[in-house]
């Protein structure tokens, strides 16, 4: 048995605010663990045949969240993988319950100033369009942190390079699952 085999038994679901690195870290984590990677946002876009920004503009956030819930449900019915969820996905009680049942959840957490700097460079996020990223993040943190705290594992990422964060996640998962990484 290789040292990462215990980490491949269940899906690893990454949760956290926008800009924390769920997709970037998720891809690298999946590669390190030899697991498939799934990005819930990309899967929603593929299922809808349009971008998230278009879904928000045409149908609104509730329609997007419903599609997101359905996509995550489908993904969690499949074999183990690393799943990058959308920032609001874990806020849905049904999605959260399913993640708790079928996956190990990891909250990637970073300082809001770091996240604001990261997302300020990217104008495709519909929740920050035309708004101050830090103000949006502060409001989201207030609403979401108590729910994110229900995650199985919490990893404080700081402003570390993605490969460092991957190592932190592997170490935290290994500790949580009670399997020594050799």
Label every PLM stretch briefly.
Residues 87-89, 111-113, 160-161:
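Short glycine-rich anion-binding loops that position phosphate/pyrophosphate groups of nucleotides
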Residues 101-146:
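A glycine- and Lys/Arg-enriched "phosphate-lid" helix/loop adjacent to the NTP-binding pocket
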Residues 14:
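Hydrophobic anchor at the beta1->P-loop junction of P-loop NTPases
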Residues 1-7, 28, 32, 142-182:
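NTP-dependent small-molecule kinase module
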Residues 22:
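Conserved lysine of the Walker
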Residues 19:
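Walker A (P-loop) phosphate-binding loop of P-loop NTPases
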Residues 36-100, 124-125, 138, 147:
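ATP-dependent small-molecule kinase phosphotransfer cores
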Residues 25:
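Hydrophobic positions on the alpha1 helix immediately C-terminal to the Walker A/P-loop
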